[in-house]
Amino acid sequence: MSGGRAPAVLLGGVASLLLSFVWMPALLPVASRLLLLPRVLLTMASGSPPTQPSPASDSGSGYVPGSVSAAFVTCPNEKVAKEIARAVVEKRLAACVNLIPQITSIYEWKGKIEEDSEVLMMIKTQSSLVPALTDFVRSVHPYEVAEVIALPVEQGNFPYLQWVRQVTESVSDSITVLP
């Protein structure tokens, strides 16, 4: 090594371009350079996960996080899934149901490992309606133990979440819904 220079490290084209933007202050202001770094790199550099904006405050929409849920139900075939989907929408237990065909489920049942082709239903509803939705699905579903699980929606497109609430509003006032 002559002249006291550090050894050169060769980097791929994308990496060297990224580093040139990050380390050359004359090219970009500091905030812009930091935006170029992927969140993963920022997490690795800081040692802690990146902070998320508060769901209630990020759009100023007034949406209450968790007031809408996405429920998941598996069915043995598309015919059964469509019948249940139409019924829950007609009864206003859900605003929308997506049918995802040809999923494979592997599970233990009565001491045996089973593998079945099923249809997955993704049901959007108010969280307050999940118990009534569950009761209805259990009453019409052909499985001995129907899968009905729900996850709260923390964030999303406010007009869509508002629409889900509006479509299901009349049922949430009178929760008793029979098959």
From Swiss-Prot:
A GO cellular-component term linked to this record: membrane
The name on file for this protein is: Protein CutA
PANTHER family registered for this protein in UniProt:
DIVALENT CATION TOLERANCE CUTA-RELATED (PTHR23419), PROTEIN CUTA (PTHR23419:SF1)
The species this protein was found in: Homo sapiens (Human)
User: Its GO biological process terms?
Assistant: protein localization; response to metal ion
Please name one Pfam family that this protein belongs to.
CutA1
PTM section of the record: O-glycosylated.
MF terms from GO for this chain are: copper ion binding; enzyme binding
Keyword vocabulary terms for this entry = Glycoprotein, Signal
**So which domain of life are we looking at?**
Eukaryota
Please name the InterPro entries in this protein's record.
Answer: Ion_tolerance_CutA, N-reg_PII-like_a/b, N-reg_PII/ATP_PRibTrfase_C
The record describes the protein's role as: May form part of a complex of membrane proteins attached to acetylcholinesterase (AChE).
**Annotated signal peptide:** 1-32
Which organs or tissues contain this protein?
A: Ubiquitous. Widely expressed in brain.
